[in-house]
Regions:
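Ribonuclease/tRNase effector modules and their secretory precursors
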Residues: 1-89
Length: 89
């Protein structure tokens, strides 16, 4: 199944600290998370070990929300959270 990344998703990815490669990885290998309004969601935790906005974070959690339209996955948006989780990619 193909993945179509909406321009809105890419804009948010840049603002929030992720990229197209991670978005595709989350969809393909992430774990399912609850989503509203009939949408689907997946998340994945990555090692980060860097500063972001003048604070150090061990990990980041990337959450992607999407729909399935025919034979393709179409992204809606992406969220990125910084902190420390148990699950690591």
């Amino acid at each position: 199944m193909g993945i179509q990344i909406d321009p809105h998703t890419l804009e948010r990815a840049v603002e929030r600290g992720t990229n197209e490669e991670e978005i595709k990885d989350v969809i393909q290998t992430g774990f399912s998370i609850p989503a509203k309004y009939g949408k689907l969601g997946k998340a994945k935790v990555y090692e980060f070990k860097k500063n972001r906005l003048n604070r150090y974070f061990e990990q980041k959690r990337v959450e992607v929300f999407y729909t399935i339209e025919g034979d393709r996955i179409v992204t809606i948006t992406v969220y990125v959270f910084y902190g420390k989780w148990e699950e690591v990619a």
